Amino acid sequence: MQNPVKSVAYEPEDLLTDRIETVIFTATTNCNLRCTYCGVSLPTYKGKDFDFSKIAGIAEQMANASVRAVQINGHGETTMLPGWANYCRQFLDRGIKVAITSNFSFLYSAEEVDVLSRMEWITVSIDTVDRELLKRVRRKVDLRTIIYNMQAIRLRAVSVYDHYPVFNWQCTLTDQVVDGLRDWVQMGILNGVEHFTLGNLIEHTELAEVLGKDGVTVPRHIAFLGKDELVAACHSIADARRLAYEGGGDMTIQPGIAEGVNARLAQLGINRMVDFSNPSTLP
């Protein structure tokens, strides 16, 4: 399913600034997981690691330029890189706030926990809290490891640094996990998660053939659901969003989800423009 959000054209002067607030830093496009919806699972995929030989100098330049924060990775898995904690420390030791996206599939060492506990924002890629389903969808990951890592980080943060990193749970929303969103939010709240993100699935059509040879059912965008299933999915999303806010957190629903749902509803003859923040718009 294609993301319906269109690109925005910028004039050159729009990019001029006297200060860079946040740097998006791609440490690697490699990943230790092979999620059943991700292009990394394709045999033709080739990732690449950043050359960290000059990382200290890069971090120093950022500090001198008054960069406030560095967002590390949004695609590959930083914590699979040897020495990743030291690379992150280069920014932290210079007063630059660090945010990271990780699948938390490794059991982290005390040194790694310490570095993570100093961060400002940690996004954990976790699509469901159903352990067996999580293994089927994301492969090579265990819910228990994720939860343990989170609590170890929170303990270190509050006991040594007198703060908590903000935890954001990110779910790539698919037909296989949408029914479990309520449990996903509840488990997150119980473990100190403050923010939840529903990610819009960008489908790779080749995956069905490649993974189908091994009997793997590839997740689909919820916009491909039938009428009854789609209506139920809409209510599941809205209920999870409400629960997140009632629990003191919030939820981001990425562009492409509502748009895909509304286009599908129109195909099914349901004249509704769903707004997940407004229950009266639900079918």
Please report, for each region that a protein language model flagged, where it lies by residue.
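Short, well-ordered alpha-helical microsegments
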Residues: 81, 107-110, 177-181, 261-262
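Conserved alpha-helical substructure of the radical SAM core
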Residues: 1-121, 132, 136-140, 144, ...
